[in-house]
Amino acid sequence: KAVIMKAIEASVTSSASVTALTRLDAEYQPSANGLEGGVLVLPSTTTSGAATAYSTIVDKGNTDETGGSYANLHVLAAGASGTLDVTVETSSSATFASDVSTALTFTQVTTSETSEFKDSAVTVNRYNRVKYVTVGGSSAYTLVVTFGHYR
């Protein structure tokens, strides 16, 4: 399970010292929809070189949801060159053999760490997965994706 929140930074304070650890305190407030429940679809995964790959399939255990979906992408490390494209795919088939459609598309990632929240009113089917495509010889990325659907 994962808790997903689109947030606004309320306050940040830090204490800096040359001889001790730096302490960072931050407060965030939900900016829309409050806290939502979801699942960790793609745990911390590191890519290497050009490839197309998929997460494990998430079975929501019920039929299509017409309320839409939401997801967070966190890129914890990015390579010196290349690109990363991440989408959430949905299907009524557990094998993704037919009727595969894209529920969410994240902004293309290049050479810097980032995070992004996406949501959509598109109907999501029972089965969902993350597709990620890396292009470029030095396209090493470490990423995490969480996903949920509105009820």
Per-region residue spans from a language model:
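Noncatalytic modules at the cell exterior or secretory-pathway interfaces
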Residues: 21-23, 67-73, 121-142
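Solvent-exposed serine/threonine-rich low-complexity stretches and specific carbohydrate-binding patches
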Residues: 100-110
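Predominantly extracellular/luminal cell-surface or secreted proteins
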Residues: 87-93, 148
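Solvent-exposed, flexible loop/coil segments flanking beta-strands in beta-rich domains
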Residues: 34-67
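Exposed aromatic-hydrophobic patches
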Residues: 54-58, 113-121
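Short beta-strand and beta-hairpin "edge-sheet" elements
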Residues: 1-34, 119-123
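Beta-rich globular "head" domains
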Residues: 56-89, 127-132
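C-terminal interaction-tip segments
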Residues: 45-47, 134-151
